Swiss-Prot record:
It comes from Vanderwaltozyma polyspora (strain ATCC 22028 / DSM 70294 / BCRC 21397 / CBS 2163 / NBRC 10782 / NRRL Y-8283 / UCD 57-17). GO terms for cellular component: membrane; mitochondrion. The gene is AIM11. This is Altered inheritance of mitochondria protein 11. The keyword Transmembrane helix applies. The lineage of its organism: Eukaryota, Fungi, Dikarya, Ascomycota, Saccharomycotina. It is found in: Membrane.
Amino acid sequence: MVDVVSEGIPVQDVEEFTEKYKNRRKQQMMRFIGSTAVTLISCRLAITRAKARHYVPNMFQLNYKPPVVTYKGETGPALVLATGITVGTLSMLVSGSCWIWDISTMKEFREIKGFSSEKVEHPRLANMPLESDSMRNVYERLELLNGKK
């Protein structure tokens, strides 16, 4: 005998759905944590590079001494760090938002935001009759819009 939850859904289906849902949320979390790690590592490297260039004067020396600059040797790593920080921050924003909204693919994003080129209808929800309170509320709002009240 199969255990049945309310509305005739077998417990096995519920357990399978729950397991898939947990794996999906775990994958979304790992994407966010990975992008956070990239951002933090890039920021940490940028800060240590900036501290290495800091000039600390000895007693009776000028407060500012122009640093020795070799543009060829410093431009590439600086560009890589800036790109890492920017891409990491953007990926944190995107993966965090997708984690909050429970979106894993672009197809789901299009369906949720209504950008889908194909019309997706949910027949169970489209033709459901309204209950009496909801129907009365709809008619009252229509009367207000038409100016009858």
